[in-house]
C-alpha cells in the first residue's frame, strides 16, 4: 500500500501504466521537476514525521518553503504560525521536536505539508503511531482540510480511520481486491461505518 502511495506521488517509478496528476503524466518528468511538483502541489505525511532535532517546530515547518530563497521568510513564518494555530499547537512553535508528543509532532507535520497549499495530501499511516484520542483529532483536522477543497489519500490498516473517508480501496498482495463507497460522514453514524468497513475487510481476507 505504501509502495502505491509512493508511486502516485512520483517518489517511486512504475513499470507500466500511467500516473496522471493535474492532467500530466508524471513519467514525462525528470526527478528535479517531480521534486518541484511534490514541493508545490503535493503534501506528504508519514507515520513518523521526519524533523530535524537541531531546529524547533516552527523552523522545521518553514524549512522546505525557504530552501534556496530566504527573502520571504517573514511571510512564510506568518503562514506557518497561522497553520499552527489552526491545528491547535500555536504555543509550541519554539519547542524542540523532542519536547512534544507524537500527536503534536504529527500536527506539525500536517502544517509543513500544508505550507504550499497543495492540491492533494498523501498520508502513509499518519495515525499509526498515535493513541485513539490523538488519531481522532488528526482525522478531524484532515476532514477540515478536505472540506476546504484539498484531496486527501490515506494508507491505513485501521478500520476506524478508513470509516471516516468516502471511498476505500482494499488491497491484498499488491492488488486492489474490493472497493467501498460511503456517504459524507455524519458524526452519529461512525459506529455503523466502522462495522461496514470491518465486515468488508473480513470478507476480502485483510
Residues covered by each model-derived region:
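Short coil-to-helix segment of the ABC ATPase nucleotide-binding domain corresponding to the Q-loop/switch region
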Residues: 55-63
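A short, proline-enriched helix->beta-strand linker immediately N-terminal to the Walker B motif
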Residues: 115-119
Amino acid at each position: 500500500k505504501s509502495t502505491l502511495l509512493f508511486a502516485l506521488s512520483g517518489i517511486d517509478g512504475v513499470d507500466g501504466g500511467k500516473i496522471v496528476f493535474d492532467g500530466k503524466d508524471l513519467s514525462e518528468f525528470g526527478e528535479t521537476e517531480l521534486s518541484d511538483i511534490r514541493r508545490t502541489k503535493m503534501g506528504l505525511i508519514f507515520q513518523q514525521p521526519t524533523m530535524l532535532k537541531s531546529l524547533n517546530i516552527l523552523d522545521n515547518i518553514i524549512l522546505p518553503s525557504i530552501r534556496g530563497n530566504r527573502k520571504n521568510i517573514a511571510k512564510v513564518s506568518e503562514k506557518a504560525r497561522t497553520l499552527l494555530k489552526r491545528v491547535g499547537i500555536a504555543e509550541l512553535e519554539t519547542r524542540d521536536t523532542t519536547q512534544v508528543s507524537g500527536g503534536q509532532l504529527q500536527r506539525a507535520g500536517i502544517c509543513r505539508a500544508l505550507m504550499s497549499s497543495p492540491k492533494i495530501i498523501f498520508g502513509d499511516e499518519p495515525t499509526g503511531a498515535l493513541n485513539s484520542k490523538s488519531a481522532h483529532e488528526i482525522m478531524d483536522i484532515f476532514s477540515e482540510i478536505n472540506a476546504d477543497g484539498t484531496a486527501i489519500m490515506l494508507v491505513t490498516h485501521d478500520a476506524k480511520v478508513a470509516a471516516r473517508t468516502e471511498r476505500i480501496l482494499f488491497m491484498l498482495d499488491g492488488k486492489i481486491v474490493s472497493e467501498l463507497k460511503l456517504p459524507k460522514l455524519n458524526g452519529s453514524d461512525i459506529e455503523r461505518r466502522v462495522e461496514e468497513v470491518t465486515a468488508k475487510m473480513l470478507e476480502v481476507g485483510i
